[in-house]
């Protein structure tokens, strides 16, 4: 089986940033790679096919590149709705195999603050 490795388990970003999600195939898969976006409680949404082609309706801030064994999904001008998990998949050879996923999350400084109220001592 072809192993798809996503070495970045998490990527921290801010709204407006540009981020790159990487994926490496254990053998040459040409450009037979797709990318998916997965949000909690939702089905995976196809983003890219054949490494660099966007599905209809996918914003053009998503771009894909690569061939052979090394692939990248780049998100320019990250929006809050882009905070999700991203998976690569090879369809060069059966069985079709997926990467383990990269979760895009807000940098801690950008996350909403939490307030704790303690009773008087």
Swiss-Prot record:
Residue ranges, annotated region (Framework-4): 98-107
Pfam families: V-set (PF07686)
Stretches the record annotates as Complementarity-determining-2: 50-56
Physiological role: Anti-influenza H3N2 neuraminidase antibody.
Disulphide bridges: 23-88
Protein name per its UniProtKB record: Ig kappa chain V region Mem5
All residue ranges annotated as the Ig-like V-type domain in the record: 1-104
Annotated InterPro entries: Ig-like_dom (IPR007110), Ig-like_dom_sf (IPR036179), Ig-like_fold (IPR013783), Ig_sub (IPR003599), Ig_V-set (IPR013106), IgV_Light_Chain (IPR050150)
Region spans: Framework-2: 35-49
Region of interest (Complementarity-determining-1), ranges: 24-34
Ranges where the record places region Complementarity-determining-3: 89-97
Gene3D superfamilies assigned to the protein according to its UniProt record, in alphabetical order: Immunoglobulins (2.60.40.10)
Cellular component terms per the entry's GO annotation: extracellular region; immunoglobulin complex
Keywords, ordered alphabetically: Adaptive immunity, Disulfide bond, Immunity, Immunoglobulin, Secreted
Region (Framework-3): 57-88
Stretches for region Framework-1: 1-23
Organism: Mus musculus
Keyword rRNA processing: no
């Amino acid at each position: 089986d072809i192993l798809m490795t996503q070495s970045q388990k998490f990527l921290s970003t801010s709204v407006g940033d540009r981020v790159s999600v990487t994926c490496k195939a254990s053998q040459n898969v040409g450009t037979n790679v797709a990318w998916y976006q997965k949000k909690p409680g939702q089905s995976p949404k196809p983003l890219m096919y054949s490494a660099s082609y966007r599905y209809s309706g996918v914003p053009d801030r998503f771009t894909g590149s690569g061939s052979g064994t090394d692939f990248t999904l780049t998100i320019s001008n990250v929006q809050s709705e882009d905070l999700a998990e991203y998976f690569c998949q090879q369809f060069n050879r059966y069985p079709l195999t997926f990467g383990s996923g990269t979760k895009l999350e807000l940098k801690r400084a950008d996350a909403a603050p939490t307030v704790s109220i303690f009773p008087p001592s």
